[in-house]
């Protein structure tokens, strides 16, 4: 089986099993997913806090724990993203797929449009890829990688003011 260098398409030969997603990438995926959902849940509770005026402040420190959990999950989210960037350098060639978009490779660009046509039911037979297809690779880079970086940068902004409250 021959795999193209940048588009990761199967060019010729019978399909064989390929070890694409290593254990550290799988761990990162599920840990990042858990941190993200905890950030969503705690962020929702921070935005629309529960009513807690039925006891003293000491007894109802529930909201403070929500903010602490949100802060811890945000830091975990940032550390996991740094870990994933590190693994893109030391992992196999498929671990850097979502970080490098090979716009210089015409086969990869054609793969974006070919996959989009298949998803729109305009093409009957998709091209086979190892790992992510070019359209998924582009979507993950733009929405996940850049989105995560923006989430981290905007989330760390409020943390810089915590020294004022001490």
Feature map (PLM): residue ranges:
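Hydrophobic alpha-helical membrane-embedded segments
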Residues: 69-100
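Alpha-helical transmembrane segments and their helix-start/interface "positive-inside/aromatic belt" motifs
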Residues: 20-35, 136-142
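Loop-to-transmembrane boundary segments
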Residues: 119-146
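Membrane-proximal soluble regions of multi-pass membrane proteins
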Residues: 92-127
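Cytosolic juxtamembrane amphipathic/interface segments immediately preceding
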Residues: 13-24, 62, 123-132
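Perimembrane loop-to-helix junctions flanking transmembrane segments
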Residues: 53-66
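Conserved small/polar residues in nucleotide/adenosyl-binding loops
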Residues: 162-166
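Alpha-helical transmembrane segments of multi-pass membrane proteins
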Residues: 39-51
